[in-house]
Amino acid sequence: FVLEQLIAKHMWLHAAEEMGLSVSDEDLRKAIMQRTEFQKNGNFDPESYRRLLAANRLTPASFEAMEAKDILTNKARLVIMDAVALTPSEYAEAQTLVSREGESDPTKAAIAKERIFQNLLFQKQQRALMAYSESMKSKVPVKIHKELM
């Protein structure tokens, strides 16, 4: 499981590179400052940041490099997800599902409709991520050194 996660991360980093994505210093700073484990009274606390990193035997530079990679892989996934949209036939399918619910209250019907559309879109986005991930496996060279495990 851990090995699969490492391979997937490597592939998504490769995809991000191919897409020309990057992480700005400002993006990285914001992401770190928003992490609750580095906050005190709802605000970023530099001392908590340094102390927690030291407790985990990390330097700020090594942690920030890992964090930047995480942000980059998430950006690559978002590019794929944002490229997905429901087709007219999928909208029609969603409308059919909405009409089957038979909700008479207009407010509840609107909420149900939105939930169904979002659910269908989410499912399609997940399929797109899986398909893209599978296609990357043939393009990205991954070498596993079993003797090092």
What role is predicted for each listed range?
Residues 1-149:
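Peptidyl-prolyl cis-trans isomerase
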